[in-house]
């Protein structure tokens, strides 16, 4: 967990009540994640990119031709910024950063279909004015 998400985790029980869902307290994180860290899972290594906006400590993992994107970028959409602790300006900066990654990286969002960085930069209406032009 990125340390900037400590407040998000702290308010999770309240949020669960507000949204009418059950919440089971998770175990304490065994490690803090920071920009540029590496995380190895199943023989694959991913780089950590801190991309606040949807949440203060939101991170994505990229490497091996993929981006594990959480709620940053979706096919044709982006993560919500109307939630407590979300930050629209930070989201815009994070989206600009993710769009600097290679066009052919496959993005697996937290939910919804997979997409690519290039496809989203070319066609995602939420990236207008945020992303650099598509490479030809």
Describe the residue ranges of each PLM region.
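Divalent-metal (often Zn2+) His-rich catalytic cores of metallo-beta-lactamase-fold enzymes
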Residues: 56, 66, 90-136
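Active-site HxH/HxHxD metal-binding segment of metal-dependent hydrolases
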Residues: 1-40, 44, 122-130
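Active-site neighborhood of phospho(di)ester-bond hydrolases with catalytic His/Asp-centered motifs
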Residues: 1-2, 50-53, 68-70, 106-111
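Active-site-flanking alpha-helical
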Residues: 9, 60-61, 78, 118
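Core dinuclear metal-dependent hydrolase active-site scaffold
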Residues: 35-62
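Short active-site segment of divalent metal-dependent hydrolases/proteases
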Residues: 5, 57, 74, 79, ...
């Amino acid at each position: 967990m990125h340390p900037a998400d400590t407040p998000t985790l702290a308010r999770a029980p309240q949020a669960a009540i507000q949204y009418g869902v059950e919440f089971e307290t998770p175990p304490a994180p065994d490690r803090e994640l920071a920009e540029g860290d590496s995380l190895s899972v199943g023989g694959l290594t991913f780089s950590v990119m801190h991309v606040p906006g949807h949440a203060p400590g939101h991170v994505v993992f990229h490497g091996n031709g993929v981006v594990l994107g959480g709620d940053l970028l979706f096919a044709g959409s982006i993560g919500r910024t109307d939630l407590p602790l979300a930050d629209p300006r930070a989201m815009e900066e994070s989206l600009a950063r993710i769009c600097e990654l290679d066009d052919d990286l496959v993005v697996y969002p937290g939910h919804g279909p997979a997409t690519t960085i290039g496809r989203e930069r070319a066609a995602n209406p939420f990236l207008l004015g945020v992303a650099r032009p598509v490479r030809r």
